[in-house]
Amino acid sequence: MRFSKQPSQKGEQKDARIVQLIELIELHYREQKNCQFYSDALALTSKRLNELVKADRGKTVTQLIHDRIILEANRELVFSTKTVKTIAFELGFDDPAYFSRFYRKQKGETPAKFRHRCSDSTI
C-alpha cells in the first residue's frame, strides 16, 4: 500500500506538464508554432514533450498547435465578417495564401468554402 502514491505522483506531474503546455499554446499559438518554443518553456526536449503529449492526448505538440489555430480560424470565419486575409494575419501567418493552404490541408476545404458552407447552414 505504501507504493500506491508513487504512480499517482508521476501521473500528476505528467498531467501538470500537459496542463502547462495547453496553457502555453493558448497564450502563444498566434506567434509560436514551433514545438521547440514549448519544450524549452517546459524544460523538456521536444522528443520527450511529444512522447508525453502523444501518451496523454494521442497527438503531437504540433498537432495540438494546429488544432488551436484551426479552432480560432473557424470561430473567426463563422462569427466575424473579417476577410480571410485579415484572419490569416491575426493568426500569425505572413502570407494569406499559405494560411489557405494550411487550412485546406487541415480541414479538406478552403477557408472561403468553410465560411460559405456555414453561412448556408444557418439560413
Where are these regions (language model features)?
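…primarily DNA-binding HTH/wHTH and HhH modules…
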Residues: 101-123
